[in-house]
Amino acid sequence: MAGTHADVRRIIPEGLSIGVDEMRAIVQIASRRPSTGRWQIVLIEDADRLTEGAANALLKVVEEPPTRTVFLLCAPSVDPEDIAITLRSRCRHVALVTPPPEAIAQVLIDNDSLSAETASWAAAVSGGHVGRARRLATDPDARDRRLQALGLARDAATRSKAYAAGEALVAAAEAEATVLTAGRAEAETEELRTALGAGGTGKGTAGALRGSTGAIKDLERRQKSRQTRASRDALDRALIDLATYFRDALLVSAGAGGVRLNHPDMAEQIAAMAAHAPPDRLLRCIEAVLGCREALAINVKPKFAVDAMVATIGQALRD
């Protein structure tokens, strides 16, 4: 998984989707024979991001795969919204269970040399995601963003704070995306311009740059898609935290004491919310967050989607 094995192709989409041109290139690579071993593995992460055209291009090679090539498609579920029915029907399904917090904590202790206390806390609030647990345990900014997301449950009930809190949530996601992508984008642009002759002298250099406008625009398009993806992912993590916070309050309100909370470190605040809001209102809050995620998935502007969510949550908590 380090990306160094010659016969393992790991496809990680950086943009909002996996397009047909990218998939055709992958299929072409997969048609080659293994170079060092007996088998070649093509691992496609986030297969739910395949466009219809990309899914059709992949379907052809999945139906008649090259000799000794195995395709692994990773998707949240086998629901038609996550993976095309035609692809699903031609694949063997392997369900992966969510690891328990204890197992995640042990991974952090063994691999990251974290204290047992820090590892246990991060594992408990990570939602079963090892990478998220590691980020929360080691990155103070990630912990601050989580608290900001959970604070929206409180601020949404106050008219003077509600929309400002929503805008701050969107701004934080965009800022996180900029930090993650800006340095790479700058390096890519500089590398391309250098390859095209920028900074050079002599006959023809200016004309070469003028003729390369299409290549530069294509790079800018891919960079914009990558940053949008990073921003949407950051906002989605915040929304998942918020939804599970309301879920915890719903469990407490319903008296489901034997179920593990997603945010055990916020038990007092969750109990206070459960005492204030009955189950039907908490369910409306959860539906509002899930509705916001669905709106973002169909490219509604984040500000509009979050504002609508905040309005619904605020009304539910104030009624």
Q: Where do the language-model regions lie?
A:
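Structural recognition of the conserved hydrophobic beta-strand(s) that form the central parallel beta-sheet
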Residues: V42-E45, L58, T69-P76
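Charged, glycine-rich active-site and insertion segments that engage polyanionic ligands
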Residues: R68-T69, A75-A238, G255-D319
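Substrate-engagement module of ASCE P-loop NTPases
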Residues: V62-P66
